[in-house]
Amino acid sequence: TRRASDIPGVHNIIVADAPQGQLSLKVQGRSDYKSLQCIVRQHGKMKTLNVQDFNTSVKYLVGKYDIEVLSLPRLNFSVDIKQSHTNTVEIPQPGLANVLLASKGHGDIFLEKDNKLELIHTLNHLSTRETLVMQPGKYRLIFKPQSSRESIYTQERSFKISSGTSTQVRL
């Protein structure tokens, strides 16, 4: 049987109860991010629901969502969207790390957290300088020149990134 509202060739409107709320993403202060985005997923699932730009608000169905901010380092949040409410996720203003190396080589940047190191970025081994937009925190650069074959030539440099500032990291 056909419902009265299902007429071929005519725009049909089907009413469904779909309570919604909004997710607003913001960066504190002036941002050096050109196009910061986050991945929005339903809570506990890995399938991407949306990729949302910062400084925007988007409507979502009521429920729990996991958010992964594509910053250095990655930031993860869990939000509970409620009907007719706006949830705001605000992250700190980033800083800049200007990495200057004496030679080409292999280097990684780690986040220093709870006396542990977490890999957050691998440097371009074909370049001697790189500028990175990073979240405030304590970091460590570990670098081995390309010409060195032994680990004894590995160098380390700890550095701190603060909101709105530029930090030079030389090795």
Name the predicted role of every residue range.
Residues T1-L171:
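Short loop/turn and low-complexity linker motifs enriched in small/turn-promoting residues
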